[in-house]
Amino acid sequence: MHKDFSDAQAFSKSFDDPARDAWQRPAEVIEQMKIAPGSVVADLGTGTGYFVGWLSRAVGPSGKVLALDVEAEMIRFVAQRAEQQQLSNVEPRQVAADDPGLAAGSVARVLIVDTWHHIDERAQYARKLAAALAPGGEVWIVDFSADSDIGPPARYRVSPEQAVSELEAGGLKAEIVQGETLPKQYIVRGARPPGQDR
């Protein structure tokens, strides 16, 4: 699914709408991820940077948040946001649509919110994410449920079972996260199998 996200200011009205907090539940998502202070995390498909403040606080001053997006305008917007909010540990980066541009073994967590369904060749992409994970690293996908009243058209949605399958095809051990309370989304976690730890 390809959509024009080049107008960051316009998308900020919906992406950063305070009403989003009620269904996105960012505090719950971050808590589930168990991010260690001082770690490096990636916010893949960062958009206008809705999650960067939460991630910045989770990793702390000695950690780093890589805010990744394919749209140059989104990256400019996030850079301004990080400067205004004094998030010195946020590093916005423009990446290619088919490559997260992450060095091998470089990140502890990758958060992918409302973005997985936009990626083509997801199993191949998952393989690149798996290679980027440090020992104990995890990929977290948060995307729209089939019955959600918001999100992409039904034909573009990716089921949690499909997301699990795609992460596993990329070499990760994946599962649907149980016990979360997001009303419009699911969470899937993919971890590096222990034997792959370097």
Segment roles from a protein language model:
Residues 56, 123-138:
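A short glycine-rich, Lys/Arg-flanked "PGG" loop and its adjoining helix->strand segment in the class I
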Residues 1-42, 50:
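Class I SAM-dependent transferase core
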Residues 42, 46-100:
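Class I SAM-dependent methyltransferase SAM/SAH-binding core
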Residues 138-164:
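Conserved class I S-adenosyl-L-methionine
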Residues 108-122:
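A short SAM/SAH-binding and catalytic strip from SAM-dependent methyltransferases
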Residues 37-38, 61-62, 133-139:
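Short glycine-dipeptide loop
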Residues 98-110:
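A short acidic, Gly/Pro-enriched loop at the edge of an enzyme's catalytic core
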Residues 176-198:
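Core SAM-dependent methyltransferase catalytic element
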